[in-house]
Regions:
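Bacterial N-terminal signal peptides
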Residues: 6-17
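Boundary at the C-terminal end of the N-terminal hydrophobic targeting segment
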Residues: 17-23
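Structured C-terminal subdomain patch of bacterial secreted/periplasmic proteins
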Residues: 24, 113-123, 130-132, 136, ...
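Basic- and aromatic-lined ligand-binding clefts that recognize polyanionic substrates
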Residues: 24-38, 129-180
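A short, structured surface patch at a secondary-structure boundary
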Residues: 25-86, 103
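His/Asp/Glu-enriched short active-site or ligand-binding loop at hydrolase and phosphoryl-transfer sites
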Residues: 50, 60, 170-192, 239
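Flexible loop/hinge segments that line or gate small-molecule binding clefts
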Residues: 55, 87, 91-120
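Short helices/loops that flank or line small-molecule/ion binding pockets
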Residues: 70-77, 98, 195-206
Length: 265
């Protein structure tokens, strides 16, 4: 009888090890993962985050943009720490070494990868059904947006000013342009660094300036100086919110795509 009991316990423990984690104390080291937790209805389980995370309630800050306070993380006794590859490998190794369950999500290079990681997070915290529900809604929204695509315009999405940086292929932000049926003027480039002269030569018909600090308005006025630029003639130089545009979540992707497509019409 005891042998059967021991066998039952062993099997039960194995099944539990395969089941999703119902984490009750989560620490997020990346703003996009914090947003995803909110979309999954799990903000109440969040016990620590970075100084850049936006939350609806006050949550202990355990990290800046570049440094994680490992001691504070440990003191909060998390069931799970989620991070991106932007977190220092040494920090991840230190957390794992002391037994803190830590999962690192790689940088998403496409909308499909954003969705896959969202579903992975849902499974990880026992919210797979909610993740699937959100993804169904978002994919339906994007399908409707893509069905209205009429644009074939040359588009430039600007990320920085000094130096000038652009959205390039093989990034999730490039999918904004692709899904809108437009053409990225940086097609063929493998680095985001670009000169103003190169942009003028490619003559975009629409420019989207992603707000990062106070430079956006200045950059818009700078582009408007070039009266022969197609985007200036078309009056299609726009400023978009970096908090949404640069954050790889299914929800913010759909919101940004909708805005871009509206402005391209």
């Amino acid at each position: 009888m005891n042998k059967f009991f021991v066998l039952f316990i062993a099997i039960f423990s194995f099944v539990l090890s395969l089941s999703p984690l119902s984490a009750k104390r989560i620490i997020s080291l990346t703003p996009s993962l914090t947003k995803n937790l909110q979309y999954l209805g799990s903000e109440n389980e969040l016990v620590g985050c970075t100084s850049y995370c936006k939350t609806t309630r006050k949550i202990p800050v355990v990290a800046s943009a570049v440094k994680v306070n490992v001691e504070k993380v440990v003191s909060l006794k998390p069931d799970l720490v989620i991070a991106s590859t932007l977190t220092q490998p040494e920090t991840i190794a230190a957390l794992k070494k002391i037994g803190v369950k830590t999962v690192v999500f790689p940088m998403a290079h496409s909308f499909s990868e954003i969705c896959a990681q969202f579903l992975q997070l849902g499974k990880l915290i026992g919210k797979e059904a909610q993740a699937q529900k959100v993804l169904r809604q978002i994919n339906q929204k994007i399908a409707k947006l893509k069905a209205t695509t009429t644009s074939n315009q040359r588009v430039f999405i600007q990320l920085g000013a000094n130096p000038l940086f652009a959205v390039i292929p093989n990034t999730f932000m490039n999918d904004y342009i692709v899904f809108a049926g437009a053409k990225n003027i940086t097609q063929g480039m493998t680095s985001g660094s670009i000169t103003r002269e190169a942009v003028l030569t490619r003559n975009p018909e629409a420019i989207f300036i992603v707000t990062m600090g106070v430079f956006a308005g200045q950059e818009k006025r700078e582009w408007e100086r070039y009266s022969n630029l197609a985007a200036v003639k078309n009056k299609k130089i726009f400023i978009i919110d970096s908090d949404k545009a640069c954050t790889p979540t299914p929800v913010t992707f759909a919101e940004t795509l909708e805005l871009i497509m509206k402005n391209l019409k």
